């Protein structure tokens, strides 16, 4: 099915959050490193919602509304400080971070504000110890170019990253403070994007600009992309956490499909005069002898119940696919899971199945007075959870009669999305008065403009000229995740051909990944040590592959240890000569018989023994010399 | 053009629209944009401004709660001196509005409903750093009034900077048969992470106890787990910003309070109330008392300055066990010869002054300097003000190192440090 995106009125906006690679955090002087070792300690905090939101007069509602949530924060004495623990006022913002953010703004043709204010954005999910995120609006009204047209950049903000969630311990959520405060730029586009491909291209372009500064962090989790997607008659959906460029295109495609299908279902429901019955039926008795493992486990729980709701006119539609592999029933299930914490639900479009018999389904339908065209949803769990789950289902089913509900959704690996939470209202923000306004002088802007970093197209030309890369390799390298590393390695190891470095980073790594090696374990240091060894003659270029495989298997080992493990211990020129002399002696009769024509045969024998330990060219030179001497 | 108006500003960087906000810099126009962010525009860059809509006067009133009195609960009066235990944020302008009625307090901290009947009143609006003896007197008078009107306990909401001075002053000036609890917050009450709520709950829990005396309640540790009840004359703010900034000095806290379970665990004996609801105040304070920190190379002339200004008392914050350099001895003698009461404390804060150990101390005693035992300098300052306000100098010299309200403990606990 080919979708005409213009016809369906597709509008996409991107929101990109990129971590900056600064020496210190945005509002304190701690380093911007993440740790996986044991924290030095933990503290407990309770965050209470702000007073301004409440109009409750009822006593119980007031107490409930003001009840705080409990969080545990892990800290390190040497890399987190009192600021992250919300025990000390923030320090002045990192000037380095501010400069990088302004570079990005200028590269995207934006207008920088005269005076920037640090704001507090209320966040009480615990991801910030203070209960708010500090954020600074710096620029607006920019644009980038894509092959399908201009994309407006409506805002660029400099803000602090949130704390890392570690686990949910039941009565408290645990966060680690190492990530809290790492500077982020938040870039928002206008909803100018009209196709999935354009969305991917815009994201790629923004990524290129960010990397051009040379000051953004690399690695999983350092860039996060949220996508706002809407179609005519549909709704604005915010999809969070898209990490991969290719996934952007897929997510947009699948979201359009989902919304179109929800609209079709709505039309069908209306035609049937469908109705959601707002009553929860206790059908525990019907299922007390049920063979379903899920139901049996639920009934063993304290206050375990099976309950049902009746959706008149929904038959055949609950099981209808709205995204590849996901159905309307999955949407109901998502809501129930998120809101009530149940494991899932059953619906009559998929029954009898899962140990639930036709007889039980029949009794169920009779009990709730379901007709041919009706669907029934059942949930089994502890009673209070079941009730909340079915209330959520009722709510979502009513939304199905209207069309597409506005939601925040989570991106899945296959390009589908799942419900996360309602779309947030306007962020509640007020000034961070602990930090003075930032006056951004024209001279400062002009100084940055005069020193803007190189853009990809400029880099492309330079790579061809300076590093003698061909068009294809230069293009690949400019867009490569490893582009900065490439230049570092070329500068450090001038006796290594840039082409070799480029093909290793963009070719060899992909090959060994295909062979099953986990290249995510490779760090810059591994590649640096590899090329250093090559530069110093410790390994031949044929040995690079084995060394990198070794580092994948043993990331903590040193280069010498890897060479030992892989049997690639370096051979000196003298050693190579001896080995070659040995091989010649061993095959003296062949030499005598064939004369110089023995070269090919002997080269094969030499390389069989020396592969990876010595450069092929070196072996070739020595062998030819030895043959001439005879 | 007024704050709150919706304006459109034309600049060389495009058009900005938003709500006009107050600006601390007269060269900057500050507006709140639709996206919630504030932005500043230099006036020199403005081409044109027009008002799109007049702003509404913001209202900060919420419907009354109509709380009924619970006869089973004690009545606690919460008096504010200017600290904001509760506050409302106006997200439009960013202003934080202090609120201090019983309804406001209960709305902010509804847990109070289950603990006590609450009366709330602001008795002054003074930043803690602007506190002075005349305000201490007013607080004491207000306390007396509340108790006479039936309060079973008093909570004083106070800025943390000088809370320990006020706690000391009230300890000496007020003799009441109900607990008087000073409480504050290290994080402003507008933010979700504020310590104000737990501190206030704990203070009210302490205020309903059948005890008497003046105390301070603040966070016991960085985490939101428990609060300490500190004796008002044995507590000091020891950190500029941490939640657990307040420490008992040369003593351990009186009690540990769990605001979640409402449990109070006493760590030492306290004076019990006899239910008489008696209250007497003595607000006589001699204000001409100075606190001088001793340091190497100091010019003792500062002492003559105070003496010539007719100061009646001087607290020296000496080094070590209570020492001062010999080159200021002549100035100290000038003071004591003139009848000024000169007393010694230590800048180590912790530990007891003892001027018998070294010759320096012995010489100081010959000059008439009196050691203050284990009182922190701030407490000694306030005590000297109180004594000089009520007694002749000779009597003051006898009383300064005698315990009156718990300010001196004659046993030095190992675990107090």
Curated annotation (Swiss-Prot), chain A:
<dbReference type="InterPro" id="IPR004115">
    <property type="entry name" value="GAD-like_sf"/>
</dbReference>
<dbReference type="InterPro" id="IPR006075">
    <property type="entry name" value="Asn/Gln-tRNA_Trfase_suB/E_cat"/>
</dbReference>
<dbReference type="InterPro" id="IPR017959">
    <property type="entry name" value="Asn/Gln-tRNA_amidoTrfase_suB/E"/>
</dbReference>
<dbReference type="InterPro" id="IPR029351">
    <property type="entry name" value="GAD_dom"/>
</dbReference>
<comment type="function">
    <text>Allows the formation of correctly charged Gln-tRNA(Gln) through the transamidation of misacylated Glu-tRNA(Gln) in organisms which lack glutaminyl-tRNA synthetase. The reaction takes place in the presence of glutamine and ATP through an activated gamma-phospho-Glu-tRNA(Gln). The GatDE system is specific for glutamate and does not act on aspartate.</text>
</comment>
<dbReference type="Pfam" id="PF02938">
    <property type="entry name" value="GAD"/>
</dbReference>
<comment type="subunit">
    <text>Heterodimer of GatD and GatE.</text>
</comment>
<dbReference type="Pfam" id="PF02637">
    <property type="entry name" value="GatB_Yqey"/>
</dbReference>
<dbReference type="GO" id="GO:0070681">
    <property type="term" value="P:glutaminyl-tRNAGln biosynthesis via transamidation"/>
</dbReference>
<dbReference type="InterPro" id="IPR023168">
    <property type="entry name" value="GatB_Yqey_C_2"/>
</dbReference>
<dbReference type="InterPro" id="IPR042114">
    <property type="entry name" value="GatB_C_1"/>
</dbReference>
<dbReference type="Pfam" id="PF02934">
    <property type="entry name" value="GatB_N"/>
</dbReference>
<dbReference type="GO" id="GO:0005737">
    <property type="term" value="C:cytoplasm"/>
</dbReference>
<keyword id="KW-0436">Ligase</keyword>
<dbReference type="InterPro" id="IPR004414">
    <property type="entry name" value="GatE"/>
</dbReference>
<keyword id="KW-0067">ATP-binding</keyword>
<dbReference type="InterPro" id="IPR017958">
    <property type="entry name" value="Gln-tRNA_amidoTrfase_suB_CS"/>
</dbReference>
<dbReference type="InterPro" id="IPR018027">
    <property type="entry name" value="Asn/Gln_amidotransferase"/>
</dbReference>
<dbReference type="GO" id="GO:0004812">
    <property type="term" value="F:aminoacyl-tRNA ligase activity"/>
</dbReference>
<keyword id="KW-0648">Protein biosynthesis</keyword>
<dbReference type="GO" id="GO:0050567">
    <property type="term" value="F:glutaminyl-tRNA synthase (glutamine-hydrolyzing) activity"/>
</dbReference>
<protein>
    <recommendedName>
        <fullName>Glutamyl-tRNA(Gln) amidotransferase subunit E</fullName>
        <ecNumber>6.3.5.-</ecNumber>
    </recommendedName>
</protein>
Curated annotation (Swiss-Prot), chain B:
<keyword id="KW-0067">ATP-binding</keyword>
<keyword id="KW-0648">Protein biosynthesis</keyword>
<feature type="active site">
    <location>
        <position position="84"/>
    </location>
</feature>
<dbReference type="InterPro" id="IPR027473">
    <property type="entry name" value="L-asparaginase_C"/>
</dbReference>
<dbReference type="Pfam" id="PF18195">
    <property type="entry name" value="GatD_N"/>
</dbReference>
<dbReference type="InterPro" id="IPR040919">
    <property type="entry name" value="Asparaginase_C"/>
</dbReference>
<feature type="active site">
    <location>
        <position position="160"/>
    </location>
</feature>
<dbReference type="InterPro" id="IPR011878">
    <property type="entry name" value="GatD"/>
</dbReference>
<dbReference type="InterPro" id="IPR036152">
    <property type="entry name" value="Asp/glu_Ase-like_sf"/>
</dbReference>
<feature type="active site">
    <location>
        <position position="237"/>
    </location>
</feature>
<keyword id="KW-0547">Nucleotide-binding</keyword>
<dbReference type="InterPro" id="IPR006034">
    <property type="entry name" value="Asparaginase/glutaminase-like"/>
</dbReference>
<dbReference type="GO" id="GO:0006450">
    <property type="term" value="P:regulation of translational fidelity"/>
</dbReference>
<dbReference type="InterPro" id="IPR037222">
    <property type="entry name" value="GatD_N_sf"/>
</dbReference>
<dbReference type="GO" id="GO:0006412">
    <property type="term" value="P:translation"/>
</dbReference>
<dbReference type="InterPro" id="IPR037152">
    <property type="entry name" value="L-asparaginase_N_sf"/>
</dbReference>
<dbReference type="GO" id="GO:0004067">
    <property type="term" value="F:asparaginase activity"/>
</dbReference>
<dbReference type="GO" id="GO:0005524">
    <property type="term" value="F:ATP binding"/>
</dbReference>
<dbReference type="InterPro" id="IPR020827">
    <property type="entry name" value="Asparaginase/glutaminase_AS1"/>
</dbReference>
<dbReference type="GO" id="GO:0050567">
    <property type="term" value="F:glutaminyl-tRNA synthase (glutamine-hydrolyzing) activity"/>
</dbReference>
<comment type="subunit">
    <text>Heterodimer of GatD and GatE.</text>
</comment>
<protein>
    <recommendedName>
        <fullName>Glutamyl-tRNA(Gln) amidotransferase subunit D</fullName>
        <ecNumber>6.3.5.-</ecNumber>
    </recommendedName>
</protein>
